[in-house]
């Protein structure tokens, strides 16, 4: 009996050592549904702080299919033969990363095969070129020819920038703009000579909707759902009005401003509900194949100022209106 017991101990120890060796050999881990930074750090025998440091995480928020480093040195932007790779930090957006590297958010989406605007801390993104220094930015700003573009209904700064192969920040600089507001008939300076012929689709949103574009200052209360959605729309070049007041008034106010309101979610649209005392709005980051949607929001499941993500099941999507 004692001999069998010793054999069992040896066998168990060997299996544990094998599992430990396998875990230590791994350098990355793909997050599965239900996992947390605690469970992953425990699996690989590292601390939560180490795991977050390796991946540039500033919170415990992780996503299914996110690839995390579990060994090696802390992540940084690196240059490879195929271009520069940037590690997303908390608070980054495609627009802010594009501005940093002197490219467009559309180009970054194309380089990385993205079909929506959702990015997360620790994610690796290919970017075109290298980070622009201040001296280089000044040099590029003082040279080159410009042309004049007449704004059409449904245009946005991002759409025009994409049409002319530039950035919306460059167009704002050329025209002395301090916000995203443009209007039909307005004349804008744009870099280069003529635009490409394929321009009609760029004036529409993902769902084919025409949307007015405002360039207001964000006057919504800091950290509220309305404040967050205003900023997310501005980031994708589809600025909204700062005068729609509480979330339960956004459907009527946006309709009065000419926006399309329906029950069909699209990436970049605003999910709106009158439920609760003030109502609620969220930004649609992704529309899933099963009819559910992923939204980003504030002041829903966390304190004001803390952005969270939530998947709204398909059967609940019908409870929301969508502002395009």
Swiss-Prot record:
Domain of life of the source: Bacteria
Protein's GO biological process: cell wall organization; defense response to bacterium; division septum assembly; killing of cells of another organism
Any single GO CC term annotated in Swiss-Prot or TrEMBL for this entry: cell surface
UniProt-recorded Gene Ontology molecular function terms: lytic endotransglycosylase activity; N-acetylmuramoyl-L-alanine amidase activity
Keywords, alphabetical: Antimicrobial, Bacteriolytic enzyme, Cell cycle, Cell division, Cell wall biogenesis/degradation, Hydrolase, Repeat, Secreted, Septation, Signal, Virulence
Cited CDD domains: LysM (cd00118)
Reaction(s) catalysed by this chain's protein: Hydrolyzes the link between N-acetylmuramoyl residues and L-amino acid residues in certain cell-wall glycopeptides
Residues of the signal peptide: 1-25
InterPro entries named in the record: CHAP_dom (IPR007921), LysM_dom (IPR018392), LysM_dom_sf (IPR036779), Papain-like_cys_pep_sf (IPR038765)
Peptidase C51 domain location: 200-324
Cellular location(s): Secreted; Cell surface
Domain LysM, first and last residues per copy: 27-70, 84-127, 147-190
Cell wall biogenesis/degradation in keyword set: yes
EC numbers on record: 3.5.1.28
Pfam short name (any one): CHAP
Protein's job: Peptidoglycan hydrolase involved in the splitting of the septum during cell division.
Protein name: N-acetylmuramoyl-L-alanine amidase sle1
Organism in which the protein naturally occurs: Staphylococcus epidermidis (strain ATCC 35984 / DSM 28319 / BCRC 17069 / CCUG 31568 / BM 3577 / RP62A)
């Amino acid at each position: 009996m004692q001999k069998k017991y010793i054999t069992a101990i040896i066998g168990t120890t060997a299996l544990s050592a094998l599992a430990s060796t396998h875990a230590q050999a791994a350098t990355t881990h793909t997050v599965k549904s239900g996992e947390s930074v605690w469970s992953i750090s425990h699996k690989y025998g590292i601390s939560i702080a180490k795991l977050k440091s390796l991946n540039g995480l500033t919170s415990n928020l992780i996503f299914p299919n996110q690839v995390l480093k579990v060994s090696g040195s802390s992540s940084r932007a690196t240059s490879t033969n195929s271009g520069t790779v940037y590690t997303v930090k908390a608070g980054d957006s495609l627009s802010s990363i594009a501005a940093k590297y002197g490219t467009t958010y559309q180009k970054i989406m194309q380089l990385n095969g993205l079909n929506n605007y959702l990015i997360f801390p620790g994610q690796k993104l290919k970017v075109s070129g290298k980070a622009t220094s201040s001296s280089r930015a000044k040099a590029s700003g003082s040279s080159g020819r410009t042309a004049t573009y007449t704004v059409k209904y449904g245009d946005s700064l991002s759409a025009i920038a994409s049409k002319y192969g530039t950035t919306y920040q460059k167009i704002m600089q050329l025209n002395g703009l301090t916000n995203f507001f443009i209007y039909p008939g307005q004349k804008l300076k744009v870099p280069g000579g003529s635009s490409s012929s394929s321009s009609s689709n760029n004036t529409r949103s993902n769902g084919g909707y025409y949307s007015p574009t405002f360039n207001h200052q964000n006057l919504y209360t800091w950290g509220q759902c309305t404040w967050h959605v205003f900023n997310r729309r501005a980031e994708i070049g589809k600025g909204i009005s700062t005068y729609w007041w509480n979330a339960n008034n956004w459907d009527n106010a946006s309709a009065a401003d000419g926006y399309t309101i329906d029950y069909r979610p699209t990436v970049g649209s605003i999910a709106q509900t009158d439920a609760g005392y003030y109502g609620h709005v969220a930004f649609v980051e992704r529309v899933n194949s099963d009819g559910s949607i992923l939204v980003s929001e504030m002041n829903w499941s966390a304190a004001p100022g803390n952005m969270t993500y939530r998947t709204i099941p398909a059967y609940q999507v019908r409870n929301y209106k969508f502002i395009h």
